[in-house]
Amino acid sequence: MNPGEPADPAPVPLPEPKRLGTLARLAPEPMKVVLNWGRRYSLWVFNFGLACCAIEFIAASMARHDFIRLGVIPFAPGPRQADLMVVSGTVTDKMAPAVKRLYEQMPEPKYVISFGACSNCGGPYWDSYSVTKGVDQIIPVDVYVPGCPPRPEALLQGILKLQEKIARESLGERYGVSPRPSTAALQSGLVRPPEPEPEPEPEPEPEPGQGPGQGPGSGEGTDTGSDAGRGR
């Protein structure tokens, strides 16, 4: 740049645009409270039972504990109809892709409770080569319930903690740019499956009139013109 030429202007920093839904931008504060109240007491739960902690989840859903009185509806038909996933039991590297796939099929807003020591950090099998060291390596988790296995009362306490979190949520944070990491950004630490061996290519079939090993480039069975020169 010559001394007489003006310097280039410095770039102006612009704030990163945030995409908020129409409901998040236009709903007044009383309406946000009503929407949070509705989501808080209408959690349709999908139980991903992998080990003995799933039995405690079933016990919590029976008449003695009856978590339906807390607004939790058990046994959703599938992940596409569920609001809450409860991962109970040991998550292995082989099962981890299925857990992640079912989580991605759940509609927003969706929540996850890690139920039991095995789901939290691997539990007594943490040093096994095939055990995922916590389901939070695959999907984001909202509430951790410790225990091996936890009692049904511990799950009820975890549900109450999740409902308190939902009541404090902002629709702008939930439906806009969420601070929760995406499932693609999380490190899974899974064991890569072996790649299939390539299939051998089939050998070309010989043309009619050619024997095995005779081809257009083999030099056999072709007239090069040298025999005609010898007969002269």
From Swiss-Prot:
Residues 196-206 have a biased composition (Acidic residues). Binds 1 [4Fe-4S] cluster. Its EC number is 7.1.1.-. The keyword Membrane applies. Residues 210-222 have a biased composition (Gly residues). Keywords: 4Fe-4S, Cell membrane, Iron, Iron-sulfur, Membrane, Metal-binding, NAD, Quinone, Translocase, Transport. Residues 173-232 are annotated as: Disordered. Its main location: membrane. One of its GO terms (molecular function) is NADH:ubiquinone reductase (non-electrogenic) activity. It is a peripheral membrane protein. Its cofactor is [4Fe-4S] cluster. It is found in: Cell membrane. The keyword Membrane applies. One of its GO terms (biological process) is electron transport coupled proton transport. [4Fe-4S] cluster binds at C52, C53, C118, C148. One of its GO terms (cellular component) is respiratory chain complex I. Belongs to the complex I 20 kDa subunit family. This is NADH-quinone oxidoreductase subunit B 2.
